[in-house]
Amino acid sequence: MPKRSIIEIENLSHTYLRGTPMEHVALKGTNLYVEEGECIAIIGHTGSGKSTLIQHFNGLMRPESGKVMIDGEDLSKKKVDLKTLRQKVGIVFQNPEDQIFEKIIGDDIAYGPFKLGLPLKEVRERVKWAMSVVGLDFEEMKDRQTFALSGGQKRKVALAGILALKPKILVLDEPTAGLDPRSRKELLDKIKRLNKEEKLTVVFVSHNMEEVAMLADRVYVMADGTDVLTGTPKEIFTDKEKLQRYQIGTPETVKVLYRLSDLGYQVKTDAFSIIEAADEVIKVLTGMKEGSQHVQRI
């Protein structure tokens, strides 16, 4: 059965402070399509329009021109049910403290479900589930005060508050910023599981190309307020000409393999995971040993 589009952005434009000396064109003719159940990464340099784009997904910004369709609903209409839309599309922003409203962790995560009018029992179940997804122990953390949390913990609480709404679309702006390596891996694994097992549609903005390679089914590259390139991680990160043209970063594993390839070694340059890249390096080292070659500096 073919998948259906759950997000359709066509020729979207947005200008901040139009008609003033501070006027700034943030989006110009941007296009983006997301199928239900996909995991999509949006990458690009600071100021390329990524954050402005995702704020159109749940009505925080309304389209000035162009089309924004979310789960079949046209957001350019005058009357849009924002409450329903924002239950359907959950956004976790880069600064999580802006999304924390309550003094106690459990109360903050329960805030959204209570606003939906859900009974106490269901709210409690949603809070427990959401906390488990982000790696917060319910009994240990539910009564802690939010002001005393680290930046990484606040990010987890903000994400749990969105997940407790059970959205159809999860939008993440730099999801692992402020997390230590272990917490980062755990959270990425859980996001991937939600996407693959729960069929949750995920759209995320990231400057971390390892995350992009690990999670994304497809990648959109933005520059100067518009989409300039789209493809799978393999298609994006193995096209050296476009990487250079748009100054796209690459996963560290790919950088190492490209360097080995430039030195004349036969390696796969599309090995994104550490394990795959390590296998390629081992092959090179084994060949050097058998041929009594010296390892060159890379």
What are these regions (language model features)?
Residues L170-D173:
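Catalytic Walker B motif of ABC-type/P-loop ATPase nucleotide-binding domains
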Residues D224-G225:
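Conserved ABC ATPase "signature" C-loop
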Residues P2-I6, T15-G29, K78-D81:
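A short, flexible loop at the N-terminus of ABC-type nucleotide-binding domains that lies
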Residues N58:
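Helix-to-loop junction immediately C-terminal to a conserved catalytic motif
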Residues Q145-L149:
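Conserved ABC ATPase signature
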Residues K67-T84:
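ABC ATPase NBD Q-loop/coupling interface
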Residues K166:
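Conserved catalytic motifs of ABC-family nucleotide-binding domains
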